[in-house]
Curated annotation (Swiss-Prot):
(6R)-5,10-methylene-5,6,7,8-tetrahydrofolate binds at residues 51, 169, 263. This is Thymidylate synthase. The active site is at 146 (nucleophile). The gene is thyA. Gene3D superfamilies: Thymidylate synthase/dCMP hydroxymethylase domain. It comes from Allorhizobium ampelinum (strain ATCC BAA-846 / DSM 112012 / S4). It holds the Pfam family Thymidylat_synt. InterPro entries: Thymidate_synth/dCMP_Mease (IPR045097), Thymidate_synth/dCMP_Mease_dom (IPR023451), Thymidate_synth/dCMP_Mease_sf (IPR036926), Thymidylate_synthase (IPR000398), Thymidylate_synthase_AS (IPR020940). DUMP binds at residues 21, 126-127, 166-169, 177, 207-209. Homodimer.
């Protein structure tokens, strides 16, 4: 995807070298935006192969409201292993905030259920928002949410999504985030009777770790291929009713994986 390669090149050429929490060092810019028309294909990288299984299972895990890595491990997904405690728990991370945001007087708010209902009943609303950033619980999370707030927008029979990501690990994290939220947009569009529009990805601190520079340079030598098509089982009408088998990526051709270390 040219949009992603443009981001890589922009940060490599214009970013500021800074320290960071992990001690690895980064090159970063503050404030960057990419836009993907989902009618033009599914926005998954073709200049390095991505593990789509991990992306789909992680999204389904979020939608379950789950915060223990047991489901992920059962399905061969290890992307959260470094942050889990000895029992596999992560604290009140994404799934908890999406599905059971605690109310001050007791009880919980299911933001995803409310979102879907709001899109169906009041599509022109400017309040189609889900937040994972809960200041009261951030300190209890194994990792505070990087992709922390998203908003949906309905126009001309199409559903678009804008994500704000406060912290963006460009080489390892951002490709997963693009595909994940593009897929979420398609799923929500299907269950609300709409077509998928655009996915807009807004980044706050967009950074390349110093030990990813060589990998980024290699990726920039590769040419993007045509985007694949994501097929979703049309019979699923409940956003919580999707299973892994309901998704099929067709015509995905990608360059080999480029390995890079995770900064924890």
């Amino acid at each position: 995807m040219k949009q992603y390669l443009d981001l890589l090149q922009h940060v490599m050429e214009n970013g500021s070298d800074r320290g960071d929490r992990t001690g690895t060092g980064t090159r970063s810019v503050f404030g960057y935006q990419m836009r993907f028309d989902l009618a033009q294909g599914f926005p998954v990288l073709t200049t390095k192969k991505l593990h789509l299984r991990s992306i789909i299972h992680e999204l389904l895990w979020f939608l379950k409201g789950d915060t223990n890595i047991a489901y992920l491990k059962e399905n061969g997904v290890s992307i959260w292993d470094e942050w889990a405690d000895e029992n596999g728990d992560l604290g009140p991370v994404y799934g908890a905030q999406w599905r059971s945001w605690p109310k001050p007087g007791g009880g919980h708010i299911d933001q995803i259920a409310n979102l879907v209902e709001s899109i169906k009943t009041n599509p022109n609303s400017r309040r189609h928002i889900v937040s994972a950033w809960n200041p009261a619980e951030v300190d209890e999370m194994a990792l505070p949410p990087c992709h922390c707030l998203f908003q949906f927008y309905v126009a001309d029979g199409k559903l678009s999504c804008q994500l704000y990501q406060r912290s963006a690990d460009i080489f390892l994290g951002v490709p997963f985030n693009i595909a994940s939220y593009a897929l979420l947009t398609m799923m929500v569009a299907q269950v609300t009777g709409l077509k998928a529009g655009d996915f807009i990805h807004t980044l706050g601190d967009a950074h390349l770790y110093a030990n990813h520079f060589e990998q980024a340079r290699l990726q920039l030598t590769r040419q993007p291929k045509p985007l694949p098509v994501m097929r979703i089982n049309p019979d699923v009408k409940d956003v919580f009713g999707f299973a892994f088998e309901d998704f099929s990526l067709e015509n995905y051709s990608a360059d080999p994986v480029i390995k890079a270390p995770i900064a924890v």
